[in-house]
């Protein structure tokens, strides 16, 4: 009883002490409330960003599952294709948990243009299957084309980052670009400085930025440079890229591909390394046996089912 009375007395004294100085107490309570709100908001924001990044990686880059020949993962050599492909495809077709899958060739190579070259990972894909599994086709920059929309040989899809590396992007100040900036709310006093550069083209972003820095103050560059770049950027669509890689016997081979589309996603590293060509074109150039597949990307109805599907596939 004495303990209960003491506890009640302490609580009573504490409550009175809180409101003895109302201003101080309100400041402390407000600080605690704001701190909690800021913490909850930050955690929610970070969780949302992580979820978006994971979703983007699954939908554009990795899918829910990938099936490979174990030796291909260890050595990355062309001859290590998936064994018993027909049986595996039959199994995937019968599993209700499997939403879609895409069979691919995959190999390392070099992409070359007259302006530059870069190492790339080349995927030979079936466009119809690829659309069912990944969303790259939804991320093609509008003015650059489509995702294998034309029924022609030797088309290639590349990322925006790789297009920059290969000098397939230029910047041109046109009347249309100036009008676009005006509509976007760029002040006339800023736009007037661009008048002397109308119809001038810059071969790369470095040259373009250098010229902009000569014309504008640091503050104007901070506020408007991204708008300048977006309004004046254009792509050398339909340009040719020469891909070189090893064929099935280890000899260097290659072919010239015409750009069918340029994709843009949140992962610039992926954009700079991964290119897509038609399965039949890559099979022909590398002299791989018909039906060869290095990986099968699988999209499930529910990612939680991945362990069960893996067990079923391995048991077969």
PLM features per residue range, with description:
Residues 2-40, 50, 59:
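N-terminal Sec/SRP start-transfer signal
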Residues 14, 28, 53, 87-88, ...:
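Hydrophobic alpha-helical segments typical of transmembrane helices
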Residues 33, 114, 288-291:
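Short, flexible turn/loop "capping" segments at secondary-structure junctions
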Residues 39, 43-121, 125-153:
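Hydrophobic, regular-secondary-structure patches
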Residues 107-174, 180-202, 259, 276-279:
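The feature marks short, hydrophobic/small-residue-biased sequence motifs that occur predominantly
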Residues 194-316:
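Mechanotransmission and gating elements of multispan inner-membrane complexes involved in transport
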């Amino acid at each position: 009883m004495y303990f209960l009375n003491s506890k009640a007395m302490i609580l009573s004294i504490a409550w009175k002490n809180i409101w003895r100085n109302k201003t101080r107490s309100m400041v402390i309570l407000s600080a605690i409330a704001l701190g909690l709100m800021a913490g909850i908001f930050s955690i929610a924001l970070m969780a949302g960003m992580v979820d978006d990044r994971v979703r983007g990686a699954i939908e554009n880059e990795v899918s829910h599952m990938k099936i490979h020949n174990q030796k291909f993962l260890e050595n990355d050599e062309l001859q290590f294709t998936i064994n018993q492909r027909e049986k595996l495809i039959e199994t995937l077709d019968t599993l209700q948990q499997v939403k879609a899958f895409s069979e691919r060739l995959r190999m390392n190579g070099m992409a070359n243009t007259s302006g530059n070259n870069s190492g790339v990972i080349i995927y030979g894909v079936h466009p119809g299957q690829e659309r069912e599994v990944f969303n790259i086709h939804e991320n093609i920059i509008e003015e650059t084309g489509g995702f294998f929309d034309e029924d022609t040989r030797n088309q290639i899809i590349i990322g925006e980052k790789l297009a920059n590396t290969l000098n397939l992007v230029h910047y041109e100040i046109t009347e249309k670009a100036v009008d676009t900036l005006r509509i976007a709310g760029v002040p006339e006093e800023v736009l007037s400085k661009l008048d002397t550069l109308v119809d001038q083209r810059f071969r790369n972003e470095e040259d373009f930025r250098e010229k902009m820095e000569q014309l504008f103050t640091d503050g104007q560059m901070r506020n408007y440079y991204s708008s300048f770049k977006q309004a004046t950027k254009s792509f050398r669509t339909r340009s040719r890229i020469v891909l070189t890689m090893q064929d099935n016997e280890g000899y260097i081979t290659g072919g010239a591909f015409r750009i069918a589309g340029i994709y843009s996603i949140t992962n610039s590293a992926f954009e700079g390394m991964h290119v897509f060509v038609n399965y039949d074109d890559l099979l022909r150039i590398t002299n791989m046996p018909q039906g060869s597949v290095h990986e099968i990307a699988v999209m499930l109805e529910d990612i939680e089912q991945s362990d069960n599907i893996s067990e079923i596939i391995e048991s077969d």
